[in-house]
């Protein structure tokens, strides 16, 4: 299945994507997934707003009847985004990620190992030190697989380093982004492989670089 991250900006597409992921994870058809999880059916539910502009708190859309293990994974991911990542508590990233974790980045690259992932995450805070995740409007889990849609905010307030050693001057403009993290967890409840999706073009437009 191919997921176009640009479609996450529209509420109907977001719900449909959540429904499709639930169907795949549970080995069901879309119709069966909609019947089992009516809150994910875009034809039966109120569409979510534009996640790149919404200012209100969204009641999370998630499957019902989760077992204790599935709830634990979602709780761990909430702590990861809201506290560890947003607070730059890098020494705690090992609470949710395996030492040899592979992370697939939005630009098509990937990193191997926990420390490499931490260094990649730190770059965001060099030019937007107030970056934080504020909501998880969609949370899906099935067994050892999770898919979570998040809303993040920040401000382009510091120079953005470039590979050639130069830097882009800050514009002082704020941004709000929607992103999706798909993760595969191991038997120790640690992420062993992670896929990150976000609309980079939308962020560039908001901070004045596109």
Stretches with model-predicted labels:
Residues 74-75, 90-151, 155-158:
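A solvent-exposed, acidic/Ser-Thr-rich amphipathic alpha-helical stretch
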């Amino acid at each position: 299945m191919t997921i176009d991250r640009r479609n996450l900006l529209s509420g109907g597409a977001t719900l449909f994507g959540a429904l499709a992921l639930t169907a795949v994870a549970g080995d069901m058809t879309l119709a069966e997934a909609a019947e089992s999880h009516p809150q994910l059916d875009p034809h039966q539910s109120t569409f979510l707003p534009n996640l790149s502009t919404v200012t209100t708190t969204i009641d999370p859309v998630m499957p019902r009847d989760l077992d204790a293990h599935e709830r634990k994974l979602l709780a761990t991911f909430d702590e990861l985004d809201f506290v560890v990542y947003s607070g730059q508590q890098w020494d705690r990233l090992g609470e949710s990620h395996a030492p040899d974790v592979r992370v697939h980045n939005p630009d098509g690259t990937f990193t191997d190992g926990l420390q490499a992932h931490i260094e990649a995450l730190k770059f965001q805070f060099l030019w937007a030190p107030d970056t934080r995740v504020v909501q998880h409007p969609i949370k899906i889990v099935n067994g050892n697989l999770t898919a979570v849609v998040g809303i993040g905010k920040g401000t382009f307030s510091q120079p953005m380093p470039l590979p050639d050693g130069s830097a882009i001057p800050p514009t002082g403009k704020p941004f709000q982004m929607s992103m999706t993290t798909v993760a595969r967890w191991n038997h120790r409840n640690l992420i062993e492989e992670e896929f990150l999706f976000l609309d980079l073009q939308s962020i560039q437009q908001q901070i004045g670089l596109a």
